[in-house]
Amino acid sequence: TIGVGESTTQFFRDWTLEMNLPDNWMDECEATYKYSVKFKNFSEYGDFHYPFWDGGAPSNSSCDILEWFFHYRATNGNPEVSFAEWMTPYWRIIEENKVVINDFESFKGYKNAGYHLDAVKFSNMLKRDFCLPRGVVHHIDTIKDCIKDTDGNIASLVGEKDIYLADMFIDCTGFKSSILGGMMGVEWDDFPFLINNKAWAVRTGYTDKKTEMTNHTVCTALDNGWVWHVPLTTRIGTGYNFSDKFISEEDALAEFKEFLGDRPLLSEPRLIEWKNGIAKKVWCKNVVGIGLSAGFIEPLESNGLLSVHNFAVYLADALSMHDGKVNTLVRAHFNRRCRKHMSQFAHFVGNHFMMTTKTNSDYWRYITDNINYMDDQAEDEQGTHGGYPLDDFPLNIDTLSKFNFNDIAGNAYICAGHMHSPITPWTMDYLSLIHISEPTRQLQI
């Protein structure tokens, strides 16, 4: 783990419920609830939220998503309410920084929430309370080399203290990818449209806990990147993501410190470097990469723990397909699932930058004018996230039918936040011809 405080998606809550974690796990891991991601200074149209909500359209209409964009166009770009407020019943509760449900018994099964948590403490708790009691043996050693068999599989890992034999090796060595990338020589596919490759990370204290311990993650755009704000119960995890193509490490640190102001630092700023991308083969021979060793996407949408969870589930699925018997098809299917997950999520993150109209620095001008977001090695996978066909914009007679009106996840919120509407004036005329009028549902202000 990078270990600077982690923000998770709502899908992580499903996993905690499945694991039946003890009630006190949040206290031990300094965890807080997360209902949304707030994007500040990413759009010239103001700040916007991406709240967690899987309850469908609040009016049970099949056109609620389209209705808001239709209303946006009909009001000449001045909608009476934001898209997030239009689609999310508990919008004002998020804004007021309150817990969404006051029935805590039913809240145990509530899924529209993620967490902010200390990833190091969380992993230590899992090892102590779940892994070791179930027979997992933890050896502390430094691996120096490996011994391969005639087929190229790793037969054993050679450590300073011992030699370790196994049928399968899971590479969790982080960005080093010591086994998958180092010993197996698996190459890396970059996501070239994601240019941020470094971050200064630090832990800070609170200056006003009542307002700063938010029930949502905050991402704030600066001149050369963006800052994350992940509030835990005792501290804040924060960091500045930037691209070294546009600013030096020293200048980025100075910009970050200026942003933090007089906030008390609880640790020294730590530089993190990475490559956005995915291993060409997440499963090679008898080695499987999980976590940072297999792939990484800059943390704008909290993909880190989600990909760890998904890859582990994909591996469990693969190993159960033929009673543990593994062949080329099983490995290929696993690799396809992992690469598809990472590619689609990478494009989802890229869409936050693709849709912005910020031009206040060389960094943002490059992002808006010089990056081809719609052309890469996964072109057939990159057009949608949350039922939103970005490659079919703007919607017209031919593409209108492809729009998934019932799926309000992902790109719908990002497009709305950037006022990137699928509805053109011409499309409005077309919709009027087929008797679709302005939204009839009463807007609540």
PLM segments and residue spans:
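Dinucleotide-binding Rossmann-like beta1-alpha1 core, especially the glycine-rich loop
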Residues: 3, 7-93
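Alpha-helix-centered segments that form part of catalytic cores
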Residues: 75-117
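Predominantly flavin-linked oxidoreductase catalytic cores and closely associated redox partners
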Residues: 110-225, 230-252
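Conserved FAD/dinucleotide-binding core of flavoprotein oxidoreductases
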Residues: 222-274, 295-306
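A conserved active-site cap/scaffold subdomain adjacent to cofactor or substrate pockets
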Residues: 266-268, 280-335
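Active-site-proximal substrate-binding core of FAD-dependent oxidoreductases
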Residues: 317-363
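A conserved mid-domain beta-alpha-beta active-site/ligand-binding segment of alpha/beta enzyme cores
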Residues: 377-418
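Single conserved hydrophobic/aromatic residue that forms the stacking wall/gate
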Residues: 434-445
